[in-house]
């Protein structure tokens, strides 16, 4: 299913839930919307306010690397389960990883990421990192998402290009 169809279905599915007004407003205002697929305990850490930075590490420069900005809406989906929360992006940092950068991230962000030694060890072969500051966390009524691919991050709606919003009148 393509990203726009996934977003449309999610908006339709959640139309009766007041807690989901944040998504409807984002879609209406063309605010970028992302879907982050998460495992426990990291999902609960965000919802509980313990985790203040969401991190994504990859071998390739894939989403959300250079595809997210402060103010974007991030929906939180449990792996194999529904979307149950969201947050607004507070800050972002994109890092091309090498040993020095990996050590810097570990030294400065382990607490905010809720990362232990095993976390960092599992990411030794990664070449890119995206750090996303978390603010305005909301718990949402659970909503199923018909997502069957293995991507851990999906950009559902991008920023409207300036040429899409500006019209020239020739009168």
Question: What are the functions of these language-model segments?
Answer:
Residues 32-39, 86:
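Short amphipathic
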Residues 46, 65-68:
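Short, well-ordered loop/turn sites that connect or cap secondary structure elements
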Residues 88-90:
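Conserved positions in beta-strands of structured domains
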Residues 1-31, 59-60, 84, 95-171:
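Contiguous surface segments at macromolecular interaction interfaces
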Residues 77-82:
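Short, charged beta-turn/beta-strand-edge "cap" motif at the junction between a beta-strand
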